[in-house]
Amino acid sequence: MRVLENCEPKRVFYYFEEICKIPHGSGNTKQISDYLVDFAKKHGFDYVQDEMNNVVIYKPASKGYENAPTVILQGHMDMVCEKRPGVEHDFEKDGLNLSVRDGYISANGTTLGGDDGIAVAYALALLDDESIPHP
């Protein structure tokens, strides 16, 4: 069972949970960058990954939107890594231990990395969704 499976919107929190499984502290973004590249490849999207592990994924426009202005969804992949005193967690190797309490998502004993982790999750969910017309 996924920790966030009852959170809405489901696809956003599916991707957020996937992101949280991957170590992605500042300066340690190769794995999360490669995850995004794998996502692009799986969906047949063009992409660019640079030497700093930045990734741009291109999704073709929906029929009828080919000449509409381009839309960019942007977020950063890294997180600030902090933990409570006494918590054993290696941010270089370990994903986050998530929980949901009283409707709030948290990471047990560590920072959540939700500030732009959720932005990346929303972008992936939108890229994955074929039902939303887009430029």
Locate the predicted segments by residue.
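A non-catalytic alpha/beta surface segment that caps or lines the substrate-entry region
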Residues: 25-69
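Short glycine-centered, acidic/aromatic-flanked micro-motifs in structured strand/loop junctions
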Residues: 22-24, 59, 75, 109
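Predominant activation on well-ordered alpha-helical scaffold segments within soluble catalytic domains
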Residues: 13, 17, 37, 120-128
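N-terminal hydrophobic or amphipathic helices/low-complexity stretches enriched
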Residues: 1-22
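Alpha-helix capping and helix-loop boundary segments enriched in small/acidic/polar residues
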Residues: 3-7, 24-27, 110-114
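Generic hydrophobic, helix-prone segments enriched in Leu/Val/Ile
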Residues: 16-19, 29, 79, 98
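Active-site metal-coordination/substrate-binding segment of hydrolases
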Residues: 65-135
